[in-house]
Amino acid sequence: MTPEEQAAHQELIEQARLLFAGRVEFLKSAPALKFLPDPDVPEIAFAGRSNVGKSSLLNALTGRKSLARTSVTPGRTQELNYFEVGEPTRLRLVDMPGYGFAKAPPKVVETWRRLVRDFLRGRVVLKRTLLLIDSRHGVKPVDDDMMQMLDEAGVGYRIVLTKADKIKASELEKVTAETIAAARKRTAAYPEIIVTSSEKKMGIEELRAAVLQDAMG
């Protein structure tokens, strides 16, 4: 980065910090597209396997302890959960239903696929999807399926590694390289990934800045 680019990046990080330090509120849960809020502000969606740490990351991102409920039952969230950021509202975060739940009946899985596919293809204010991948496991076949769905919908997405504090540095380096390689094979994936730990607050500043940049871009 040039000194000018570095200064601009630091300014973006500070703007994002101030934004998320302000108003962040749960708006609604939408079990079907007809319940979505009016498409009047930019939206950033969060996707990931069940138990990937999505709720914990949303809580860390917003600086709240229990904004997004952490469920002990994987695959429990089968709705699009909306959170508003800013006063007045500058953007909305969309917590998408988790995928890859082994015990879900086929009907539930099909309902999930239809809801997510139709949301991705038809939501004009959706600026970016953040695809969360567990650092301990790397990209799984179900993650590949989600990437394919995003590619087909033409929705740009960033890959975010979660729980980076749970593995050794050498293992993290390996899974990061493998994830970058997987992203570069995809048409709609952002080529750089963000490595995070909700528990250690690692990468949270960068993630906030990315969310703000994507929403306003």
UniProtKB/Swiss-Prot annotation:
Keyword annotations of the record: Cell cycle, Cell division, GTP-binding, Magnesium, Metal-binding, Nucleotide-binding, Septation
Cofactor(s) listed: Mg(2+)
NCBIfam families hit by this protein: GTPase_YsxC, small_GTP
Position of the signal peptide: none
A GO-annotated cellular component: cytosol
Domain EngB-type G: 40-217
List of residues binding GTP: 48-55, 75-79, 95-98, 162-165, 196-198
Sites where the protein binds Mg(2+): S55, T77
Pfam family, one: MMR_HSR1
Any one Gene Ontology BP term: division septum assembly
Family from the record: Belongs to the TRAFAC class TrmE-Era-EngA-EngB-Septin-like GTPase superfamily. EngB GTPase family.
Stated name of the protein: Probable GTP-binding protein EngB
Purpose: Necessary for normal cell division and for the maintenance of normal septation.
Sample GO molecular function, one term: metal ion binding
